[in-house]
Amino acid sequence: MQSKFWFEFLQTLPTLPGDTVPVMAIQASPGETSGELIIAQAPNQTLDNNNSALGGLSPLLFFPVVIIAVIFLILVTIFLYTRFYVIAPNNEALVRTGGVFKKEQMVILHGGCIVIPGFHEITRVSLREISIDVVRAGNLAVRTQDYMRANMRVTFYVCITPNRNEILTAAARLSKKGQISEADIKDALEKRADDAIRAAAKKKKLAELDSDKLGFADEVLNLIQGDLRKVGLTLNNIAISEIEESDTYDENNFFDAQGVRLRTETIQRSIQQKREVELTTRVAIEQGELEAEKKSLAIKREQEDANITQQKEIELLKLAQRKELESQEAQQQREIQEAKDKEEAKKERNKILQEQAVEEERIQKELAIQNSQIASAIALEERNKELKVAQALQKQEAEVAEIQRKKTIEASQLQAKAEIALAEQKTQITEQTAAIAIANKQKERLEAEALRAEAESGVITAQEVEAAERAQKLAVIVAQQDAQQHRIAEQNVVEIDVFRRRRQAESARQAAELEAESIRTLADANRHKAMAEAEGQKAIIEAHNSLSNANRTAELLKTIWPELVTQLPDLIKALAPQPGVLGESRIYSFPGLSGSNGNGSNSGDINKLLLSTSGLTLLNGLLNEGKLSTVVDQVKSLLQDPPSVSPPSAAVSEDDWPDLAPPTETNFSPEEI
């Protein structure tokens, strides 16, 4: 920029004729970044014409160049000064090591020095005073001479003395990375301080440490000062801010155990002394208070006696006056009250008489209404009971008649089927021999007698059962009616007596009792109805059971009929009289008795049935009367044809059912088969 300025300045100067201006080359200053070479060349003609003029102006060009060079040198000097010259602050010292030609250490205080990178190294040493707290508490508590453990905070005030030797020692012992920091000083001090504190504490008891903090601080100072000077540090002062007893004792440690014992003894002794002082003080205070209280009470008692005496006199006067006034007022009040009482008694008596009259009239009306309601309810209940009893009897009679009708119809059906079976069998038997016809007649007679006996026994049984049931039901109904009438009569008597005795206070409860009694009466009627229905159901079940017996008999005949049909010819032949046999000896032989004829087990069952006592009796009767074929035909027709309803007149008459003959001795012989 300066070269351009001078170049433009030269161009503005006037040209001299006849002089030649040489070519000038101006190189850019070191500050120019372009490094551009500026060449100023005047026109040949102009330079030649003005050559002499420039020769006269050369001193003017020399001074600016000199000024520029001087300014440039000043700037370079300032730059080098600020770059390589280091000044020590007021609270720091500089230690320069190294050199260009000679290696040496230099301590700079309140000044500066040249530091050339690569040749010199600077260490900054702070001269400020530093406070370092060393805390020993908890598990790190200090043990004293009496084996007690103490928590304490000790503050050390250290610095580096502005002395060449101490500065060089501190720089050599404590510096890191070209400086000495507070952390470096604390690291150098803490362990030395710990040893000094513990050593000084072992020389004093806990109480002495607390009472003589300055002596303890001097002891620590004397112990640590020599070690700190070896590293270039100077200990200015020690401050002990607090000393407290620690509670971190280990009872398994010998020293701690001694301390705990001493601590306990001291504490307990102090507590005892404190308690003694407190008791002594309290006794003295209480004695003084007692004396003062006695004097105060004596004075108060005298005052109270005087006051009481005066109050008694005043009260006696007031009492006399009050009694006189009260007697007068009482007399007046008594007279007024007597008049009021008489008037009130008169009004109350009239009111009571009116209320009694109204209440008696109301009670009479309610009694009449309740009596009529009770009578109506009783009459209605009796009609309902009679109606229910009549309905129950009608229902039972209808059920019994239905059962009897069913029994009669079923018996008629059985008899009709038996007659049809006998008629069909009779047409087959007539083709047999005369001996077989005689046997058939005897069998028919026996069959008729058996059927008649069975029918008679069935009719008698049914009539007896029906008569017993009817008598039982009638007895139950009569008993129910008698009990109901008796209960209603007793109830009426009780209710009338209750209504007469309890007038006003129990009218509501009487109505409730009557309602409950009505409910109980209905419940009794329902219960008796249920009993009557149960008895009727029982009769129906028994009738059904008798019908079931007849049905079971028919099922049995239906089961054995196929076997009986196949063996019927052999049976008739076996039952026929054999020539050469005397008397009425009959030999019955039934094929398959032992179950070996290939017909299975049914043959054995038939033989067992017919060989029983009743079977032999029936068989003998049928043989004597010759009605076996008739019975067989009827049974066959009954089992083959469906049941049909027939009138009772279609049954076999009683003449066809002769009495059964007594059983005769029967001998079985294999030759008669």
UniProtKB/Swiss-Prot annotation:
Main localization, broad class: membrane
Membrane-spanning parts: 60-80
Keywords recorded for this protein, A-Z: Cell inner membrane, Cell membrane, Membrane, Transmembrane, Transmembrane helix
Membrane topology: Single-pass membrane protein
Gene Ontology cellular component annotations, sorted alphabetically: membrane raft; plasma membrane
Transmembrane listed as a keyword: yes
Ranges annotated as biased composition (Polar residues): 664-673
Location of region: Disordered: 639-673
Recorded superkingdom: Bacteria
Subcellular location: Cell inner membrane; Membrane raft
UniProt cross-references to Pfam families, sorted A to Z: Band_7 (PF01145), Flot (PF15975)
Family: Belongs to the band 7/mec-2 family. Flotillin subfamily.
Subunit structure and binding partners: Homooligomerizes.
Biological role: Found in functional membrane microdomains (FMM) that may be equivalent to eukaryotic membrane rafts. FMMs are highly dynamic and increase in number as cells age. Flotillins are thought to be important factors in membrane fluidity.
Alphabetized PANTHER family for the sequence: FLOTILLIN-LIKE PROTEIN 1-RELATED (PTHR13806:SF31), FLOTILLIN-RELATED (PTHR13806)
Protein name: Flotillin family inner membrane protein sll1021
Annotated organism of origin: Synechocystis sp. (strain ATCC 27184 / PCC 6803 / Kazusa)
Taxonomy of the source species: Bacteria, Bacillati, Cyanobacteriota, Cyanophyceae, Synechococcales
